[in-house]
Each structure stands twice: as C-alpha cells, then as structure tokens.
Amino acid sequence: MSMNDPLGDMLTRIRNAQMRGKSTVRTPGSKLRAWVLDVLKAEGYIRGYEEVTTEAGHKELEISLKYYEGTPVIRELARVSKPGRRVYAGAKELPQVRNGLGVSIVSTPKGVMSDAAARSANVGGEVLCTVF
C-alpha cells in the first residue's frame, strides 16, 4: 500500500493516540519524520522518540507522548503544506501560530526547524505543519 503523505500520516497517528490517552505511538521511520520529531521534542511537545526495528526488519519510530495533568500537551496539530498544495514562506512571512504561543515547523535549506529558529537564521522554506 502506498502512502501519499507520510508526514500527514504521522501527525494523524499522534493526534489519534493522544485522543485515546496512549503513552506511545509507532510510525514508519524516515529522515523527515525524525527531523520533525526533533523539533517537537526541542519545543517540549513530546517526551522523545526512538528508532526501533520490527521483526520484518522495517524501521519504525516509537514516539513517547507528553501529557500535563492528564491532558495532552499538543492541543492542535495541523498539516499546512500538502502534496497537492505546497506552501512556502520567506523568513519575514512565516506564520505565527496563536500569536506566538504555538510553533510552525519549517523545512529550510539549513534543515527542519521551528519558525522562531528560521526567523533568527533569516531563512524561509516550506511550512510543514503547525503545533499548538
């Protein structure tokens, strides 16, 4: 089965697992997914993740979700740039999520980073998703 939007699939798995109160969730592994998870961990939205190998030899990422007093830390997780409609923004046009309370994750020539890091590095790129 082919997957048209692997990053969107990972975000949906995280949303669904948090709605069910799960402590961890697994998703197929890729570099882009790992880079996005690095940003989520640095911003404090997840506890962390580790790469595991299944019995079939496939690599998966096991994500440890974060809760505060029983409620998920991630309230809103949305894909912005989709395979059918890519969204790009310059350093000055990067969107602010909830007046700066949330984070946009951006794929730049210098790597995947948060909107604040991209603004300070003065680089723009593809706006992958927003987190609040």
Swiss-Prot record:
The protein's name: Small ribosomal subunit protein uS8
Keyword Iron-sulfur: no
Subunit relationships: Part of the 30S ribosomal subunit. Contacts proteins S5 and S12.
Entry's Gene Ontology BP terms: translation
InterPro entries in the cross-refs: Ribosomal_uS8, Ribosomal_uS8_CS, Ribosomal_uS8_sf
Gene behind the chain: rpsH
Domain of life: Bacteria
Family assignment from sequence similarity: Belongs to the universal ribosomal protein uS8 family.
Entries under PROSITE patterns matching the protein: RIBOSOMAL_S8
Molecular function terms from GO: rRNA binding; structural constituent of ribosome
UniProt keyword list: Ribonucleoprotein, Ribosomal protein, RNA-binding, rRNA-binding
Annotated source species: Paracoccus denitrificans (strain Pd 1222)
Function: One of the primary rRNA binding proteins, it binds directly to 16S rRNA central domain where it helps coordinate assembly of the platform of the 30S subunit.
One of the record's GO cellular component terms: ribonucleoprotein complex
Phylogenetic classification of the source organism: Bacteria, Pseudomonadati, Pseudomonadota, Alphaproteobacteria, Rhodobacterales
The UniProt record lists the keyword Protein biosynthesis: no
